[in-house]
C-alpha cells in the first residue's frame, strides 16, 4: 500500500497526559479512513496533527511524501469540518462557500462557477442567498462540506460532522457524502465513536484506545476478525 497520508511514530502530550503514544498509520490516496474509538482515545488529536492545529512532540506527519510538521494550517490544504459547522452567521450561503476563493482573490466568474458546482453537488440549489439561521441542520452541514471542498482540495478531514443531526438525516447525509467522496476520489479522514457509521462508510477503519491504534483493517476485518478483546467488544455493540 502506497501511503498518501502517513503518521510516523507520532507522540502528543498535554502536560503529563500522553494523548498519542507513538501512533503510526498509512492512508492510501482516495481512501475513506475512519478513526473509531471511545471519547478521549486520541481520534481528534491525531486528526489535528494533520490539520496543523496541533504539533507532535515526536514523530512526523507526511502528505504525498512531504513533511507537514511546522506548517501552518492554511499551507497544508487539509480542510477540517467540525461538528459545529463553524459557518459565518453574517454571511449568505454563497459568501460562506466562496470565502476561500475570496481570500485567494479569485475572479467573480470563477467564484460563481465553483459555488454553482458545490450547490448542485450538495443539493443546495436556490439557497445561495440565505443565511445559516434560515437553514436546517442538514443544510448547514452541507454548506460546511461545500465550503471545505470548493477550492478543489484532495484531502478532507471530518470531526464527528453528523453528530448534531437526527438519526434519519444522519444516514441520508452520510450516504451523500460517501457518494461524493467516491466520485471525486477525495482522501478522507473521518472521526467518530459511532460503530455503525464507521462500518457503513469506510474503506479502512483504525480503532483507537488510550492514544494507541489497536487495529487497522477493512470494515469486514474489524468486525469479523478483531485483533483483540477491546476491538471485539467495542465494535460488537452494533445491532
Language-model regions, residue ranges each:
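ABC ATPase nucleotide-binding domains
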Residues: 76-79, 83-230
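Helix-to-loop junction immediately C-terminal to a conserved catalytic motif
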Residues: 51
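The feature captures the beta-strand-to-loop junction immediately N-terminal to the Walker
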Residues: 36-38
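A position-specific signal in ABC ATPase nucleotide-binding domains
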Residues: 54-55, 62, 102
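Conserved ABC transporter NBD signature motif
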Residues: 59-67
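ABC ATPase nucleotide-binding domain helices that frame the ATP-binding cleft
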Residues: 44-47, 143
